[in-house]
């Protein structure tokens, strides 16, 4: 949990090796990119003429060409790489879940919606969720609970679970577990 002083270092410098380790970049291999990882990153298969003219126009206005927006500088204009290879999107599900298909340690619940994280004694122990029919379920973890619900739903789940700004949680009748 960001802001939690548990000794974890979530700085750019600390997490970069993990990003490099997950990446399989077909063009860039340097201090910012990796190869051989699960996430396939490549240049667009085709760059249309309109996009080329746009980049040239912005360069004519004085912006530098940037061949790597995930490199040392994010300033400039250029063509972004994509998380795909040979026209197939390299999603987190494709990269990390597909290899675990059939693994008894993993259970996927499709067409289910997480409602809150179950907290016991200040520790996440599971998830409360509803299936497609609206039936309420709880799943408990044997180890850790990893929340990867995206940029919008992750904070929503945390707040519905009592993790967030205490005043805001109380306004909505949610018991405060952690004031962030």
Q: What residues fall within each predicted segment?
A:
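Glycine-rich loop(s) and the adjacent beta-strand/alpha-helix scaffold that form part
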Residues: 117, 126-180
């Amino acid at each position: 949990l960001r802001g939690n002083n548990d000794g974890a270092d979530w700085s750019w410098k600390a997490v970069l090796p993990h990003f490099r380790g997950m990446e399989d970049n077909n063009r860039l291999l340097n201090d910012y990119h990796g190869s051989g990882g699960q996430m396939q990153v490549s240049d667009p298969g085709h760059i249309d003429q309109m996009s080329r003219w746009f980049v040239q126009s912005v360069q004519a206005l004085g912006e530098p060409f940037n061949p790597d927006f995930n490199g040392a500088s994010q300033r400039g204009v250029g063509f972004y790489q994509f998380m795909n290879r040979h026209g197939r999107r390299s999603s987190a599900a494709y990269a990390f879940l597909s290899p675990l298909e059939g693994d008894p340690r993993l259970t996927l619940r499709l067409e289910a919606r997480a409602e809150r994280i179950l907290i016991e004694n200040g520790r996440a122990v599971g998830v409360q969720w509803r299936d497609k029919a609206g039936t309420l379920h709880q799943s408990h973890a044997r180890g850790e609970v990893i929340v990867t619900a995206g940029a919008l739903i992750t904070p929503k789940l945390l707040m519905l679970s009592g993790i967030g700004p205490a005043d805001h949680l109380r306004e909505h009748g949610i018991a405060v577990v952690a004031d962030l």
